[in-house]
From Swiss-Prot:
Organism expressing this protein natively: Campylobacter concisus (strain 13826)
Catalyzed reaction equations: L-lysyl-[protein] + 3 S-adenosyl-L-methionine = N(6),N(6),N(6)-trimethyl-L-lysyl-[protein] + 3 S-adenosyl-L-homocysteine + 3 H(+)
Gene name, Swiss-Prot/TrEMBL: prmA
Keywords: Cytoplasm, Methyltransferase, S-adenosyl-L-methionine, Transferase
Lineage, uppermost ranks: Bacteria, Pseudomonadati, Campylobacterota, Epsilonproteobacteria, Campylobacterales
EC number: 2.1.1.-
InterPro entries: Ribosomal_L11_MeTrfase_PrmA, Ribosomal_PrmA_MeTrfase, SAM-dependent_MTases_sf
Protein name (database record): Ribosomal protein L11 methyltransferase
Keyword Cytoplasm: yes
GO cellular component: cytoplasm
Length: 277
């Protein structure tokens, strides 16, 4: 562990969800969400991310003709034990019959326990999109299904699918994410059928259920590959999407059957089905 770390504080009311979505796309490993504030902590300099956020906010302000209320600060701090402080702030969460907890918390009986520690990769179950995905997977995934997690991040959804009895493949374009997924799988005593760093382009296998909890722009880019990865009658769960993209999602996936939409604050998730012929 290095002696110092960088802490980037991003405060905004007008562009909170958009900037949070942008931050997710940067692939940083430790994000804390507060009321109208996003805090990023890393051991490498975050000045490029700070610049990107500032430019993005300027663009949003110009296009939408609303005030730019962004306040941003970047500080170099002594690395006393910020991860320890973060641990104290992370609480377990129950999502239907799945209990997500950090390793230092006790297990909960009568439900499926998933252990996810902070600072590995995104996905602790607290964010609306991940929470919605967990609810939807419990509803549509069946034991024995083949499943694909696109953009697996921390591996929380892959692990949930495995614990639901699915045969799971997972991928992410970020090698740190795939390594985090493998570490978390080992922590939870589950195994994936296959995991790789890369995309789903030219993927030959088809699945009973495919989940993509990633930002909307990437979903649009991968839309054809996502559709091709479905078996007849298979389910596609899309999440990580701000509600402003709802109409565009519906248009992009109109050749599939829309089964369910789940709204959580400004975030929306979709369940589609590949229609049987």
């Amino acid at each position: 562990m290095k002696d110092k770390f960088y802490e980037l504080s991003i405060k905004t009311s007008n562009f909170y969800d958009e900037i949070l979505e942008l931050v997710f796309s940067f692939g940083v490993t430790c994000v804390e969400e507060l009321d109208h504030e996003i805090i990023i902590r890393e051991e490498y300099d975050l000045k490029d991310i700070a610049w990107g956020v500032e430019e993005y906010a300027k663009g949003l302000s110009s296009v939408r003709k609303i005030s730019n209320d962004l306040k941003i600060s970047l500080n170099l701090k002594e690395n006393k034990d910020w991860l320890g402080e973060y641990k104290r702030a992370v609480k377990p969460i129950l999502v239907d019959k799945i209990y997500i907890r950090p390793s230092w918390e006790e297990s909960l009986s009568g439900v499926t326990n998933i252990i996810i520690d902070p600072a590995l990769a995104f996905g602790s179950g607290h964010h609306e999109s991940t929470n919605s995905c967990l609810q939807l997977l419990q509803k549509y995934a069946k034991s024995g299904d083949t499943a694909l997690d696109v953009g697996c991040g921390s591996g929380i959804l892959s692990i949930a699918l495995a614990k639901l009895g699915c045969k799971v493949d997972a991928c992410d374009t970020d090698e740190q994410a795939t390594q985090s997924s493998l570490s978390n799988a080992q922590l939870n005593e589950v195994k994936f059928n296959k995991i790789w760093t890369g995309s789903i382009a030219n993927l030959e296998q088809k699945y009973d259920i495919v989940v993509a909890n990633i930002i909307a722009d990437v979903i649009f880019m991968l839309s054809n590959d996502l559709k091709k990865s479905l078996k007849k009658g298979g389910y596609l769960v899309l999440s990580g999407i701000l509600n402003k993209y709802e109409d565009r999602i519906k248009d992009t996936f109109k050749d599939l059957e829309l089964v369910e939409i789940k709204q959580a604050n400004d975030w929306v998730s979709f369940v589609y089905k590949e229609m049987d012929e």
